[in-house]
Amino acid sequence: KILKLNNGNADHENRSTFIKYETTDGKQIVYETYKLLQCKKPILTEMDYNFKWSGSIMPKITSDLQDVINIVDEKNPDMYDKAILKFKKPLHYNQNSVLHFKAELDDVDGKSLPHVETRVTDEIDIIHYRIILKHKSETYDKNAILERCKMNSNMSSNFEKIKEIAFDKNTKSYEYHLLNPEVQYYYRITWEK
């Protein structure tokens, strides 16, 4: 599991998010997020990207568009780890930019959970999920589940199913466009490991 957060900060607005989770063998995983954001303060030089990986090995964090200046491993399963991403050039008020976060995940011990989760704290137009499972057999055809949970509830017991997402056998992937999701919810796509 990797958890991506929309921070709800007043220093920027997130208009769209594109998430890709890809594995060829079920053990080595690449998780990437692209966020279109708009600066809402006079100058923005860096951003925190909070994440939670449920595997046991700390991921390798990079970015194609920003400099990763620090990674904070909280070493606490109840807290989010953090990557600090510095823009190549400072953003000015109302300027748009794309934030890129990439995590190379090692699940060789099989401890990670098979889901991608997003916290929505502010209005956003779209969250595009693409989960590519190249290691699945030609006969695999299980649906993934899109579900949500109020942010202030006990997460483990209060997820409600929104819909099932069919597995595309040609691309070996799940793909879903979550349009204008309701604020103050966790949204999660789960699949069979």
What residues fall within each predicted segment?
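Lumenal/extracellular ectodomains and adaptor appendage modules
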Residues: 1-193
